[in-house]
Amino acid sequence: MRLDNPLLVQWEYASEERLATRNATYRALVEGTNPEELAFRFVAERAPKDVLEVGCGTGELAERLGRELGATVKALDISHRMVELTRARGVDAVVGDVQQLPYADASFDVVVANWVLYHVPDLDRAVAELARVLRPQGRLVAATVGHDHMGELWTLLGDAATSGLSFDHDNGIELLSRQFARVDRHEANGTVSFPDRETLRTFVAATTTRSHLADAVPELREPLRTRSVVAEEPR
């Protein structure tokens, strides 16, 4: 099933548990450039007054942007649960769709869309909306993964192709360039080392489209090292 399937997205983000498991495992095990820190830096470079984060998840980044940059931050997510969690952090968050943003033209200095655009059915419409709400000379920060993200892991489990990515490391520049005159890609590559079968199985079980492979995880004779390929594409 594709990641831009609305029913899949609704199911995946009705609760935070699976997202929290993926994030906690990845953060604990990754070595190399931290894509979350890279995204924060791209926002901070602009010293923005007004920031919008779409696909805000549990609100960690939105809260940090307001706290550390002193920016006025608004957040949007299609999941009621994610908005609830973000509001609990003190962030002004609303339930909404990136394909039809509830904000006026030229409202924000920076818009953040991290690991969300591959969930959108109509990418062209979504990117046009992101461009619409940005002020002149504003910046969009959009993170996604590469087609070979954690390729060694999926090859081990017999599912080598990155499934369902409509917006990825390879086509991101072309898709964003339809609305933005300049798009720069920065890679945040690293290595994720899974120390044992149970850690790996827990991670796989929490993935969106490959959770059915969890029981196929074999015993590991040595830690499994797999590449993490993430692209940040600021305007």
Positions of predicted regions on the chain:
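Conserved class I S-adenosyl-L-methionine
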Residues: 1-47, 60-61, 139-167
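Nucleotide donor/acceptor-binding cores
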Residues: 48-50, 106
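A conserved beta-strand element that flanks and buttresses the S-adenosyl-L-methionine
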Residues: 112
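A short glycine-rich, Lys/Arg-flanked "PGG" loop and its adjoining helix->strand segment in the class I
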Residues: 124-136
